[in-house]
Amino acid sequence: MERQVLLSEPEEAAALYRVLSRQPALSAACLGPDVTTQYGGRYRTVHTEWTQRDLERMENIRFCRQYLVFHDEDSVVFAGPAGSSVETRGELLSRESPSGTLKAVLRKAGGTGPGEEKQFLEVWEKNRKLKSFNLSALEKHGPVYEDDCFGCLSWSHSETHLLYVAEKKRPKAESFFQTKALDVSAGEDETARPKKPDQAVKGDQFVFYEDWGESMVSKSTPVLCVLDVESGNISVLEGVPENVSPGQAFWAPGDTGVVFVGWWHEPFRLGIRFCTNRRSALYYVDLTGGKYELLSDDSLAISSPRLSPDQCRIVYLRYPSLVPHHQCSQLCLYDWYTKVTSVVVDIVPRQLGENFSGIYCSLLPLGCWSADSQRVVFDSAQRSRQDLFVVDTQTGSVTSLTAGGSGGSWKLLTIDQDLMVAQFSTPSLPPSLKVGFLPPAGKEQSVSWVSLEEAEPIPDIHWGIRVLQPPPEQENAQYAGLDFEAILMQPGSPSDKTQVPMVVMPHGGPHSSFVTAWMLFPAMLCKMGFAVLLVNYRGSTGFGQDSILSLPGNVGQQDVKDVQFAVEQVLREERFDTGRVALMGGSHGGFLSCHLIGQYPETYGACVARNPVTNIASMMGSTDIPDCAKSCRCVVEAGFPYSNDCLPDLSVWADMLDKSPIKYIPQVKTPLLLMLGQEDRRVPFKQGIEYYRALKARSVPVRLLLYPKSTHALSEVEVESDSFMNAVLWLRTHLGT
C-alpha cells in the first residue's frame, strides 16, 4: 500500500500556514463600569486586546475589540460585539481608572534607531485625550518597563496619580579625552569659551550593567515612579531597599504608600523570565516618611500580589523553595490591618484521584477577587488540562469552575464584580472568548458561560489524553508511583493508520507542560497528515510537587526514558508507521530530542531541535540561569546544589557532561535540523554550534539555521514562519512524502 501523502509541494504547506496563522490570540481583557440604561437595563463593556501574525508586514499586530454584556446582576442576558476590531499601534500598557472614567496609556512613538523612539504617557477621558506627557523628554528616568515581570501601570484610588516602573536614570559618561564644545552664544566682544559641562563621569562609558537576562535585555535597575496627573510632576520614590529591584507595584489602601515585590539582585542578577524561584519579598514604602516595611518572609520567592476590593487583604503566590525554577506554589493572604499572613492553599505533593493537584500559574490575573473580597479566581494546569478554580480565602476550599467540560483548557483574563472574562480553546479549536458570572459560594460548579467570540473548529484533527505508567525498572526510588501523560493528536479518519507518520514533541522547561489548548505548530502538522505526540514527562507542572522534584538530578535519563516509553506505547497501540517517526523540540525539548537520537538512534528518522542544550558543562558560564532554568539544567537540574560564591569541582563538571546529549554523539545517525537564535541569552547559540560541528565531523546529515536578531523563543513572525517551513521540508526530505 502507498504511504500517506503529507504534502506534494512546499507551496501547499505555506498556504496552510498562512490560513492557520491568522488565528488571533487573546492577550488581555478589562471590564468597564456598570451602566444602567434609561429603560432600566444594565450592561458592562468588555475591552479586549488581541495579537495576530501579519505575514505581509512580518510582525505581530495588536488590535482591540469591545463587547457589550447585558446582565441582571448574576446572569448574562445578552452579549455581543460593539463595533469592529481596531489595530492599536504603539500601545505598551493601558489601564482604566477605578471608576472607569479615565484611561492611562503608555505609548511609544518615533523612529526605530537608537535614541529615536520616545515614550508618552497619555490620559484619556471619554472621547478626548486629556493629557500627554513626554516621558523621554522629561528625563526623570530611563525607559518604562512594559513587561509582566516588573512592569505595572496603576491608578491611585483617588485617580490623581499614576504609578509605574522604569529604568533608573544613568549618569552621563564621557571619555577622558572628550573635546568640549565652545560656547558661541557669547556677545561679539566676548571671547568664545568652553560650555559649562554636564556632570558627566569620565571613563564610565563602557561600564557593564547587568540585566535580568532573556527577553529582559537592557532592564537592569528598576525604580518606582509616580506621576501627578494634574501638575505633570514625576517623582522617583525613595525608600526602596538598596539590595532589591522593585516591580509589580500598586497603591496601598488609602494611597498612603506603595506595595511592591522586591527581587534580590546581589551578588548578581540571574535570568528572571520563566523563573519564579528568584528570591523576592513583599514590601511597603510609606510616601510621607520614605521608609519601607517588609510584609512577607524574605527567604523565599513570591509573585503577583493582588489587593482585595475592600482594600483589606492582599493575596500572592509564594514558592516554598528557591529551586527548581518553577514549581507548585502556595496562595498566601496578608491582612493589611492585623499584619498577619496565612497560607490559604498549600503545596500539593501528589494528586489523589481527580482532586486538585496544586497551583502552577506564574502570575495571578490583575483582576482575581470576587466582589465580596472573600474568594479568589485563577487558572492553573491540572495534569494535561488548564482549568479555572475559585478558592475561599476563609476556609481554603478549592472548587473547579470548569470541571466536567469538553476537555479543553481555560485561561482567566479578569474578574470584576463577579463577572468573569475567560478564554477557552482545544488542540482543534482556536481561542474563544467567554463571559460568565461567578455563582454564590457553594454553587460554583454551576457557571453559565456565554460566548462573545466563538472560533471555528479546525476539521479533521482528533485528539485525546494518554495516561502512562513507567515500567518498574524506570520508577524513581525516591518518588515511586508517579505517572505522566501525553496528548495525542492525529489526522481524522486516515485510510490506513500504518501509513501515518508521527512527530514527537517533548516540551521545554523542564518544569512546564503541554495542556489541551490551541497550538499552531501541532495543529499544522496534524493537518498535513502527521500524528503528533506531546509528552508531559515526569517533572512537568500540573502533576503535584513530587513529580517536579523527581526530575532534578535525573535529566537526560528519567525524562528521556519517559518520552521513549510514550513513543513505543503509542506506536504499539495506534499502529502508526514505525519507519517514519520524527522529533521536534525546543529548549529542554531540544535537549531531550538530541538525547533521544543519541540513545535511541534506530527509532527516529528525522529531528528538528530549536535552541537545544547540548552540553550542560560548557553552558554554565554563558547562560543567564546557571542555577536551574527554563531550558538548561546547569547545576540544580543536574542534581547538585547551586551557590553564587563557588565553582563546581571536577566531579560535578564530569557529571554535567555525562548528562548532556553531546555524550551520545558517536551513536547519532538521525538527520538533524538545528535552529538557533543568535541573541538567545538562555541557551547561547554556541551550544548548537558545538553539536553541529561534532555531527559534521562524523558525516551525520545536519543543517543549521542561525537567526541573527532572534532570542530563545524564536517567536518573531519572520523567524517563526521560516523555521516552520524549513522544519516541514526537513521532515518531507527525510521521512518521505
Swiss-Prot record:
InterPro entries: 6-blade_b-propeller_TolB-like (IPR011042), AARE_N (IPR045550), AB_hydrolase_fold (IPR029058), Pept_S9_AS (IPR002471), Peptidase_S9_cat (IPR001375). The modification Phosphoserine is found at residue 185. One of its GO terms (biological process) is proteolysis. It catalyses: Cleavage of an N-acetyl or N-formyl amino acid from the N-terminus of a polypeptide. The keyword Hydrolase applies. Homotetramerization is required for activity. Tetramerization results in the formation of a gated channel which is involved in substrate selection and substrate access to the catalytic sites. GO terms for cellular component: cytosol; nuclear membrane. It is an enzyme of class 3 (hydrolase). Its EC number is 3.4.19.1. Keywords: Acetylation, Cytoplasm, Hydrolase, Phosphoprotein. This enzyme catalyzes the hydrolysis of the N-terminal peptide bond of an N-acetylated peptide to generate an N-acetylated amino acid and a peptide with a free N-terminus. It preferentially cleaves off Ac-Ala, Ac-Met and Ac-Ser. Also, involved in the degradation of oxidized and glycated proteins. Belongs to the peptidase S9C family. This is Acylamino-acid-releasing enzyme.
